[in-house]
Design a protein with these regions (language model features):
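Helix-loop-strand module that forms the ligand-binding subsite of alpha/beta enzymes
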Residues: 52-154
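Glycine-rich phosphate/pyrophosphate-binding loop and the adjoining helix
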Residues: 20-29, 140-168
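Glycine-rich phosphate/diphosphate-binding loops that line cofactor/substrate pockets in enzymes
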Residues: 1-3, 57-58
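N-terminal beta1-alpha1 ligand-phosphate binding loop
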Residues: 2-35
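Flexible, glycine-rich phosphate/dinucleotide-binding loops
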Residues: 13-14, 49, 130
């Protein structure tokens, strides 16, 4: 059975109720069942969580699925806080050991000290921007994809831990 860890990064704040990302996360919970050949663990960043239990979920998972809105061209602050605190707790506890560099030559191998090799992740983002804002010449994002633009750092963060992006 594939072990799936789903994280709902949709945050309740102001006029954003986080309902759409909650709905997407609920669809995952309906699909990733034992009957379909999956084991599932789930976190909603709006609920209380234990840092070491969250670290253990990352270590346990074969695939991590992140669902998040994009606010002001980045992650909602509670989701960013979740990642910062969980990944920090995961230092030498299964998420990453070091930044990968060695004393003999500290100029190379930065970002290779992750402990989650062999695992994959998938990122879904929700926007108020139309697809054409990314694809049409002269539009706001200058023909730069979400992955190569706004979410580039997010993808590098996952690479730092050793995870690879799931194709699709």
């Amino acid at each position: 059975m594939k072990k799936i860890f789903v994280i709902n990064g949709g945050q309740h704040f102001a006029h954003s109720g986080g309902k759409f990302n909650k709905t997407i996360s609920n669809w995952d919970q309906e699909f990733f069942t034992d009957e379909n050949g999956f084991e599932l663990k789930y976190t909603d960043i709006n609920e209380n969580y234990n840092l070491m239990e969250e670290v253990e979920k990352f270590v346990w998972a074969d695939i991590v699925v992140y669902h998040t809105p994009v606010w002001w061209f980045g992650l909602p602050y509670k989701f960013k806080q979740y990642l910062d605190t969980v990944f920090t707790a995961g230092h030498r506890n299964g998420i990453y050991y070091s930044d990968g560099r060695k004393l003999e030559n500290p100029e190379i191998n930065y970002g290779t000290g992750g402990s989650l090799h062999g695992r994959q992740y998938m990122l879904t983002t929700t926007w108020n921007a139309p697809e054409t804002a990314f694809t049409l010449p002269g539009e706001f994002f200058n023909e730069t994809s979400v992955d190569d633009g706004v979410m580039f750092g997010f993808h590098r963060m996952n690479a730092f831990t050793g995870m690879k992006k799931l194709d699709g």
